[in-house]
Amino acid sequence: MKLFKYVLAFVLTVILLGIARHISIRVPEFAEVISDGIKLSHTSVTEKIGAGDVKILATLVIPSPEENYSLSLFYKIGKGEGQYTSVKMQPVEGTNDQFSAVIPSLPKGKRAYYYLSLSDSQGKKILTLPEKLDLLNNPFLVKFKGKVPPYVIGPHVLLMFASVFFVFLVLFTSLEMLWGKDSLRQLSVYSLWATILSFLGGVPLGILVTNLTFGEIWGGFPIFTDITDSKTSILLFYWIIFLILIKGSAFGKDKAKNLLPDKALAWFGILGYILTLGIYLIPHSI
């Protein structure tokens, strides 16, 4: 039975972290707009890892090659009311319908918003990509990130994986306790390991990953509002509180020192699982 719990916890951990990774990755978006026989298309650039300019490519198909059109890239640094910089896109050598321009390299942690604009020979704007630019339909976004070496990101992911594995064991053990089985000692051990591994993966290594990626030390609650760091804070806060409630069993074998009865602790374990599940299903800021 114990082996089955471990195998099931492992499988569910793989599934959960796979889903979490999938919803956190910003996939390049193919966008296209057609107007009066003119077709403009572009696959967005979502991130730039490491130093270097960001090359923006677009495809422009026009019905009458003799007509004169001007395709421009507009970009600005950071969100807000700042002015866009305009760069005329140049034909890509060896092609008839490919155009390119670059967004200059920026420090890690910076963001650039951009869109494409096509004008006729009189300078009149014909179309833009994205087609509608307003508060509800933002321009394309590219994030500038630093490189995170494998020897940093590897242990970080492994520790967070292990912490979720123990959270699933907390869930299974909590359910056993509600069904009448005396699994308090197991619950305390699993919750202790979940807390320790979450701390190691989320604080020293999590802070290092954030610093290498965005150039920040800590961007989350209670100081800032970064989603990923704030999730780590909330998760650690809950599991530390849970350890305090179950301290008699977690740090010894004195059940009398626990601050809540067994079934209440089981419900706290289930709530911890639900919180962990919800937090991991919130996309990372990275």
Locations of regions flagged by a protein language model:
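Membrane-helix boundary/interface segments in integral membrane proteins
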Residues: 209-221
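A loop-to-helix transmembrane entry motif
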Residues: 190-200, 223-231
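Residue-level detector of functional hotspots within protein domains
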Residues: 143, 189, 193, 207, ...
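Glycan-association/targeting regions that enable binding to alpha-glucans and other polysaccharides
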Residues: 1-167, 171-185, 197, 201, ...
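N-terminal low-hydrophobic presequence detector
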Residues: 154-156, 160, 191, 231, ...
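Generic detector of multi-pass transmembrane helix bundles and their immediately adjacent loops
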Residues: 219-224, 228-286
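C-terminal TM-helix exit segments that contain a strictly Trp-centered aromatic cap at the helix terminus
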Residues: 200-212, 276-286
